[in-house]
Amino acid sequence: MNDKYSTTEGKTSEKLSDEAMLSAQWKNIDWHKAEREVNRLQIRIVKATQQKDYNAVKRLQYLLTHSFYAKALAVKRVVTNDGRRTPGVDGVLWNTPAKKMAAALSLTDKRYRARPLRRVYIEKKDKKKKRPLGIPTMYDRAMQALYALALEPVAETTADGKSFGFRKGRCAQDACEYLFNALSRKHISPKWVLEGDIKGCFDHISHDWLLANIPMDKNILKQFLKAGFIYQRELFPTEEGTPQGGIISPILANMTLDGIEKKLVERFHTNALGKVDSRFKNAHKVNFVRYADDFVVTAATPELALEAKELIREFLAERGLELSDEKTVVTNIDDGFDFLGWNFRKYNEKLIIKPSQKAVKAIVSNISDTILRRGKAWQQDVLIMKLNEQIRGWTNYHQSVCASDAFAHLDYVLYELLWRWAKRRHPKKNKCWISTKYWHRVGNRNWVFSTENKELIRVDSTAIVRHTKIKATANPFLDVAYFQKRKFDKGMHRLTGKFKTIWKNQNGLCYHCGMPMDVTEEREIFYLAPKAKTGTEDVRNMRYVHCACQRIYAENRLKK
């Protein structure tokens, strides 16, 4: 009995020792060096792709996917994103430094078998329908993140120039600017627009096409594609489409749709010698802009727009995809069309881009839900914090278009909803009492919904700032300084007051990792000395950090 106890005690001690060692190794990873080493290989993959040396691409991808630093970065991505607390079918979470290090050491392509996805259903934006979502295991997510590091340099190099969705350094505002350039000139710009809608793009891409055309390890890709999913304890196979909820899925979808622009250029912009001819380009006025699976084609006549539609239909059919005839329509620019949450329409030959009615209704619905349902019992400062998050996100997205009227309307809606919220809380109090309790004078502004510490953002105070479109040929792996400057400039445009000062002082770099930050992505303020001790928000004590970096920093301090 004593011998058995001693053996168990020894194994426990050994396990604790191993965990301590793995934990220390994870905490001591040099993330700067990891980024540099992986980026060095990615640059070589880009150059090999440009030279069409696909044997070199394959060799370099192998080196990258077998690199410890790439594996560590893949695990880091999985354990710091929003789904880090959501397990797959195996119920496993990597929630300690030791588990993360063990995971990084265990990633391998040898005998790799992807586990089925866990199927859940989440509400769509209209809340009337639900859409399926597949949740891979942590291990499968990390494998996808690892192979995405090797595939993305190829995807960025071969991508259509006017493709802007799910790509590094590109955004919906870039797509908007390119459409503005194509449609804004008086009496010269194209009059007709083909609004494209692909039926269930991510769900129906042909596996045969992907396996034949995507330049990556075919066995690994097949595992990603054929994993299947489990719903209500029953296993279902996947015969088409990209992995739902998968990290690599947007890259696969983009690579599937890349080539539409080239096909349109060959048909409408080139002469009999196969060279781009400005005469054809100016006569046909065919332009193409795509964001993920949403696209727009401009044309001089409705007949040319319909011809473009047929070319795209043929292109998609080879990939197992088809257009929705009901939603793929040809529209005159004077009647207007919606794209990416904006309405594009000409009024007396002047192009106006503004938030679409659907986008305005959506934000009003979300704010109403926050105030009257979720926030009915919240304290005022909590409600202000939640509303400010929603308002900032919406105004940041729309501040590069003609949004002043929409912003003013949103201010009016906010006031009406907040007054209803206050009346519900104090049904026996009069208007004067309610207004005195919740609305105050702040600086030169009257009637500000505020507390001692927080105040509600005034929506129409958001400055309208024209977005600077990206160079269509820019590559994020080669033009590093260009992309870093764009990120910094975006922060300088979006931020105000002390937050702009902090951003400027740090040159837009994360205080923890030293890597560039994107002002539109997750970031937070880190206090050098705890705010509880200083009691003030002095910019000298404040630094911007990535949320993911702050989580790692806090975790490492906690485990010490």
Regions found by a protein language model. Name each.
Residues 1-2, 370-429:
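Right-hand nucleic-acid polymerase module
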Residues 24-83, 149-165:
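Charged boundary/loop elements
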Residues 226, 232-235, 319-383, 389-392:
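A conserved non-catalytic segment of reverse transcriptases
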Residues 411-495:
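Extended C-terminal regions of large enzymes
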Residues 514-547, 551-553, 557-558:
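Histidine-centered nuclease catalytic patch
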